[in-house]
A protein has these predicted regions:
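Small-residue (G/A/S/T)-rich helix-start motifs and N-terminal tracts that mark the onset
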Residues: 2-167, 174-192, 196-223
């Protein structure tokens, strides 16, 4: 414990000199084109938060996340949105998650649905999704959605209503990998954030193959 830790120093994590040298050496290549380093001057690009403001001033985030056995993904996504400055956060999740999320994060807005509601009332559900999308300035889609049969339709309804930026992660990407026709709904508003395993499922390429050409694979997938 702390008694045996000795003197603790907090060091700047920084970037290894070797890493920065590798970035410089890669200039002119696909990897170099996407390698960016930031300095103190770049902090000035972050907009100042006005003092004369309210929670509606700082954006509305709709998070479509969580399933019966994975409410933590929804909770952590919403908490992260608040901690990075979002003014209003709404969670669209399954009904089973309502109570625990209201207890753990009472400041969040909860909009709940049931898988049966989605599967049996497609048109009504689609109208509900459209209304939620009109409310939002940005959407997060995927964390902890699971792989139930209804997830395909949920992802489709979000993508067809994507008039604001939509960040797709985790099970949202898995649904797209399992149902490739969903990529036909991609627009300039869609941002995907796959890890290596998810990228392998999306592209059909092996993980080792992707590792050898990370930037190139991303560029090719982006079209």
């Amino acid at each position: 414990g702390r008694e045996y830790a000795g003197q603790v120093e907090v060091a700047d994590i920084g970037f290894p000199v070797q890493a920065l040298e590798a970035v410089k050496a890669a200039e002119g290549t696909a990897a170099g084109d996407f390698a960016v380093t930031y300095g103190d001057e770049d902090l000035k690009r972050i907009p100042r938060r006005p003092a004369y403001s309210n929670k509606g001033t700082f954006g509305k985030v709709l998070i479509v996340a969580g399933s019966r056995n994975m409410c933590g993904a929804a909770y952590l996504s919403a908490l992260s949105a608040y901690r990075t400055g979002a003014g209003l956060v709404k969670l669209l999740t399954v009904e089973e998650n309502r109570q625990i999320l209201q207890e753990r994060l009472p400041e969040a807005i909860i909009a709940a649905y049931t898988p049966d509601q989605l599967m049996e009332g497609r048109e009504e559900f689609r109208k509900m999704i459209e209304a939620q999308m009109e409310w939002a300035d940005v959407v997060v889609l995927g964390p902890g959605l699971g792989n139930g049969p209804y997830v395909e339709y949920l992802v489709e309804d979000i993508l067809t209503s994507a008039f604001v930026p939509v960040i797709i992660d985790a099970d949202g990407l898995n649904a797209i990998a399992g149902h490739p026709y969903l990529t036909s709904y991609y627009t300039e508003n869609i941002i995907v954030t796959p890890h290596l395993g998810e990228m392998a499922r999306l592209t059909g390429e092996g993980i080792e193959q992707i590792k050898e050409n990370l930037a190139g694979t991303a560029l090719e997938y982006a079209g």
